[in-house]
Swiss-Prot record:
NCBIfam families per UniProt: PRK11650.1
Gene Ontology BP, a term: carbohydrate transport
Gene name per UniProt: ugpC
Highest classification ranks of the organism: Bacteria, Pseudomonadati, Pseudomonadota, Gammaproteobacteria, Enterobacterales
The protein's name: sn-glycerol-3-phosphate import ATP-binding protein UgpC
UniProt-annotated location(s): Cell inner membrane
Binding site for ATP: G37, P38, S39, G40, C41, G42, K43, S44
Length: 356
């Protein structure tokens, strides 16, 4: 068991352009951290820096309070699971799982014990003599995980391990990963572009954008209190509604085009007259009526999802999505009267994009 610390680490490809801006992260012993963000945000590069596969330009990486910044990957006490299973096709499941231990010179008896225990944990007991071609995608990924488990690492590193699986199998493997972490309690750093994976697997999420950690927090914190416009737009499906407008002179209402004024929860007089962005999750918008002071929205389209529905409409040039109960099925062109609860509104600075 070990903690992991990244202390102001940076990465530059040409010595000038930083692809990882100074980033600090403290992962507690046994904690499961998920790095999530769009392609090119730097999450896989950062993971490879922790693994020792990419050189750290500046800063330090420590595992179990030991500085490993210049240490060879094999000496860091890490095990990595990749998107591609990278199994040897001519070897059995048992041989694939044992191979890394053999080349390290571990004794046969100890190897056999470790492989047997990993196979038991991953329910691969009956598959040990099979070759990779005889396995399903999920079974191959289990073998790849088993190969990492037998090493008994201080830290697990996962680089989008579920990306090659179909949707149904990804759900199953997410559950298995959760159960595996509860059993092993090994410090883990996991990379994905899939926010569902991030929200369901993580104890804490690090949302990355352009080489910067936009926000680090629990899945609930990141969802309920996004620190920036980027986090608000990236986390959530569908994404948070983001509406541009201005805070009125009294700081009590948010004014949109078309004379719509939404009451704000608390005083925002210091932002009076400033261009801001207001956010609200689709599920936090309630149906109301004209008599109750509801705000009108002309509906463009309706997505029927089964458990619920998504109504898409516009206020002028600004789009709005409302999550409705499954029995609510308004037709295109109809007017919905909406209530936007003050305590569910998020306000972001129009210039910096940061939460206020």
């Amino acid at each position: 068991m070990a903690g992991l610390k990244l202390q102001a680490v940076t990465k530059s490809w040409d010595g000038k352009t930083q692809v990882i801006k100074p980033l600090t992260l403290d992962v507690a012993d046994g904690e499961f951290i998920v790095m999530v963000g769009p392609s090119g945000c730097g999450k896989s590069t950062l993971l490879r820096m922790v693994a020792g596969l990419e050189r750290v330009t500046e800063g330090d990486i420590c595992i179990n309070d030991q500085r490993v910044t210049e240490m060879e990957p094999k000496d860091r006490g890490i095990a990595m699971v990749f998107q591609n299973y990278a199994l040897y096709p001519h070897m059995s499941v048992e041989e694939n799982m044992a191979w890394g231990l053999k080349i390290r010179g571990m004794g046969k008896q100890q190897i056999a014990e470790r492989v047997k225990e990993a196979a038991r944990i991953l329910e691969l007991d009956g598959l040990l003599k099979r070759r990779p071609r005889e396995l399903s995608g999920g079974q191959r990924q289990r073998v790849a995980m088993g190969r990492a488990i037998v090493r008994d690492p201080a830290v697990f590193l996962f680089d989008e391990p579920l990306s090659n699986l179909d949707a149904k199998l990804r759900v199953q493997m997410r559950l298995e990963l959760q159960q595996l972490h509860r059993r092993l309690k090994t410090t883990s750093l996991y990379v994905t572009h899939d926010q569902v994976e991030a929200m369901t697997l993580a104890q804490r999420v690090m949302v990355m954008n352009g080489g910067v950690a936009e926000q680090i927090g629990t899945p609930v914190e990141v969802y309920e209190k996004p620190a920036s416009l980027f986090v608000a737009s990236f986390i959530g499906s569908p994404a948070m509604n983001l509406l541009t407008g201005r805070v009125n002179n009294e700081g009590t209402h948010f004014e949109l085009d078309g004379g719509i004024a939404l009451p704000l929860n608390g005083g925002y007089r210091q932002y009076a007259g400033r261009k801001m962005t207001l956010g609200i999750r689709p599920e936090h918008i309630a149906l109301s009526s004209q008599a109750e002071g509801g705000v009108p929205l002309v509906m463009d389209t309706l997505e029927i999802l089964g458990a619920d529905n998504l109504a898409h409409g516009r206020w002028g040039e600004q789009k709005l999505v409302v999550r409705l109960a499954h029995q609510e099925r308004p037709t295109a062109g109809s007017t919905l009267w909406l209530h936007l609860p003050e305590n569910q509104l998020h306000l972001f600075d129009g210039e910096t994009g940061q939460r206020v």
